[in-house]
Amino acid sequence: ESTAAILAILIVGDLVAFARRTDVAPLILIAVAHAQFEAIHPFPDGNGRTGRALIQSMMRHYGLTTNVTVPVSAGLLQNTQRYFDALDAYRHGDVTPIVSAVAGAAQVAVGNGRLLVADLRGVADSWAARLPSRQGSASRRLLDVLLRRPVIDSDTVAAELGINIGNVGRTVQPLVEAGILREFTGFNRNRMWHVKEVTDALDAFADRAARRLS
């Protein structure tokens, strides 16, 4: 192995040891680990994506996120000049800009996530008013599934609700009649449905996360 390759292995090992520290505030630790990974640049390609994935992995490891992915990397890339300037400052010994950038991106991401939650709650409330079936019915229980899985087929409905696949049609039909579900294949068999209100909310969430600052 070349001297450069051996040195890269040692430096990455040092980064891993640093990332396991427990005496540094998690968000600061994550920001510095990310910047150090980008400075090492260990791979011929994909360092940026891997470095941003490291942020998500460390956030999960330190309990800052649990069941969701917070789009911090998208927040960093909203202002690419600020992000690259922060990485450059880190290489020259100043950690403050990258810590500030990661903290700001996390704050933006959390705000974006809260907007998504509010949008989905509004959708769920409108469904409850539009669906006439009784509480606890399979059709009502399907509403909770649709917030997690806005595109479904018969197998999905049967598995999620624990019902016979032959009963899927009568479960889905009230939601179709209420304008909640839409069948989009046009097939008589192997049909699939989607919830436009949920996919629209998710699209808006993604658009906000990807929006660049001028």
Regions found by a protein language model. Name each.
Residues 151, 180-183:
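Short hinge/loop at the helix->beta-strand junction immediately C-terminal to the helix-turn-helix recognition helix
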Residues 1-118, 122:
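Phosphate/pyrophosphate-binding active-site loops
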Residues 146, 168-179, 193:
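Basic amphipathic alpha-helical segments that dock to polyanions
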Residues 208-214:
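Helix-turn-helix/homeodomain-like alpha-helical modules used for DNA recognition
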Residues 112-143:
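Short alpha-helical segments that sit at the start of domains
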Residues 139, 143, 148-161:
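Short acidic, hydrophobic short linear motifs in intrinsically disordered regions
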Residues 164-165:
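Short coil turns linking two alpha-helices in DNA-binding domains
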Residues 135-136, 183-208:
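Short, cationic-aromatic polyanion-contact patches
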